[in-house]
């Protein structure tokens, strides 16, 4: 176990010189705290600052790649960087292909600025393969979805959907001001607060719609934390997501400064079994074009709605906040999101990490996260580089808890929202695998 004195990483067999980042410009659309004139990196400060850097890192695939830059970035002389990204084929698994997805976006049909007519085309142009519109379902149609807007969202998704090339999905965001927000996809109707006034009532509504899938959004932002992640076993198969990256924020230590538990720990310890996701939660008019905001990778049999929903239900996904990243991981040959048949013993992890030539040889770390009481316990830290497969073994025991997650980090940068002093995850989060569960 790694204590608060800091990690002692063991090394994979890759050694490259570290890149020097340009002064004042971090590689994730963030702001370098050393040169930030505001002198701080609060969540809202980061959000406002990130808006000036809308660099698209184009990814390969069927969607047309483009490069966008705001007037603010252009006037500052900031370059528009196109990052081709990694191949969509895993080096360690067969039978699936990587697609890049953003499953949480807003329009003027709730509290967004942009017309829903433009959203899917923008996301496809930006290089996404899978996209969803998820406007708020609140208490009143004036601030959230109406029945006619729900129908319109479905019509727009059907018009934009291009099986094999681009998957367009209709969803909604159940939005409780105190308990939190939950995205729902693949249902024929939607539930607002008049129909489902609590997380528990929403779970019952969801279970009545067997194809529906849902996600805990920006977990811990609202004080009630989904009734403190109160567990409903009947809804567990359909609660397929926990947002670890929302906008530019890493939610691992959300609430730590006010001494509340990590949402990851609270959710998984409660018994839920979500995959881990990243989303832009876009409220502007440039859907898909924000480098540095969350996004998800899904491993699909094909790029269709049915295959996307299958991958979500299997938790065969990862969270990141960089475009073009490929992350695949296995534990004793089991892909992320799966069950490892083990009581105790050594578990061999293989981690395929790549972002193409733009990150070739870039130093990264893989942290092995296990249950803790308020923050995850880090039982190993492995140095690796982009473009390689990390291969390492860690002893695990179900007596210490039934889940394990891999966090990929950039050791050169600090986590703007850190946890306890000396915690190994106080570096900059790049990606999270979905969990595995130990099940004897």
What are these regions (language model features)?
Residues 1-41, 52-58, 67:
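N-terminal secretory signal peptides
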Residues 22, 30-33, 72-74, 78-84, ...:
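Intrinsically disordered, low-complexity polar segments enriched in Ser/Thr/Pro and acidic
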Residues 39, 61-91:
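C-terminal segment of N-terminal export signals and the immediately downstream linker at the start
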Residues 41-47:
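N-terminal export leaders
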Residues 47-49, 64:
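Hydrophobic single-pass membrane-targeting/anchoring helices
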Residues 59-60, 323:
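Ubiquitous "structural anchor" signal
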Residues 77-440:
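Extended, charged catalytic domains and RNA/DNA-binding interfaces, predominantly
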């Amino acid at each position: 176990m790694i204590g608060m004195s800091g990690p002692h990483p063991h090394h994979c067999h890759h050694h490259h010189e570290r890149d020097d980042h340009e002064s004042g410009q971090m590689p994730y659309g963030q702001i370098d705290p050393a040169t930030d004139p505001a002198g701080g990196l609060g969540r809202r400060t980061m959000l406002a600052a990130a808006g000036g850097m809308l660099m698209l890192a184009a990814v390969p695939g069927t969607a047309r790649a483009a490069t966008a830059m705001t007037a603010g970035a252009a006037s500052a002389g900031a370059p528009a960087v196109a990052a081709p990204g990694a191949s969509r084929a895993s080096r360690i698994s067969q039978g699936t292909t990587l697609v890049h997805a953003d499953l949480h976006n807003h329009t003027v049909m709730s509290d967004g600025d942009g017309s829903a007519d433009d959203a899917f085309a923008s996301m496809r142009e930006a290089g996404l393969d899978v996209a969803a519109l998820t406007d708020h379902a609140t208490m009143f149609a004036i601030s959230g979805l109406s029945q006619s807007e729900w129908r319109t969202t479905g019509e727009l998704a059907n018009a934009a959907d291009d099986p094999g090339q681009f998957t367009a999905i209709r969803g909604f965001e159940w939005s409780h001001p105190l308990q939190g927000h939950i995205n729902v996809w693949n249902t024929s109707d939607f539930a607002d607060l008049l129909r489902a006034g609590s997380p528990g009532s929403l779970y019952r509504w969801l279970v009545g719609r067997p194809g529906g899938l849902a996600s805990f959004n920006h977990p811990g932002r609202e004080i009630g934390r989904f009734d403190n992640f109160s567990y409903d076993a009947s809804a567990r198969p359909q609660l397929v997501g926990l947002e670890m990256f929302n906008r530019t924020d890493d939610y691992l230590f959300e609430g730590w400064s006010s001494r509340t538990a990590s949402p990851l720990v609270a959710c998984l310890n409660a018994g839920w079994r979500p995959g881990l996701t990243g989303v832009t939660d876009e409220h502007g008019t440039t859907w898909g074009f924000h480098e540095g905001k969350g996004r998800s990778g899904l491993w699909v049999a094909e790029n269709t709605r049915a295959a996307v929903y299958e991958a979500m239900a299997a938790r065969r996904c990862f969270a990141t906040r960089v475009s073009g990243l490929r992350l695949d991981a296995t534990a004793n040959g089991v892909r992320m999101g799966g069950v490892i048949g083990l009581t105790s013993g050594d578990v061999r992890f293989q981690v395929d990490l790549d972002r193409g030539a733009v990150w070739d040889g870039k130093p990264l770390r893989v942290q092995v996260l296990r249950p803790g009481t308020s923050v995850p316990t880090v039982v190993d830290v492995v140095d690796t580089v982009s473009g390689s497969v990390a291969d390492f073994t860690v002893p695990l025991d179900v007596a210490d808890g039934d889940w394990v997650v891999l966090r990929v980090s950039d050791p050169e940068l600090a986590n703007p929202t850190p946890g306890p002093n000396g915690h190994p995850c106080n570096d900059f989060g790049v990606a999270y695998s979905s969990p595995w569960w130990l099940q004897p």
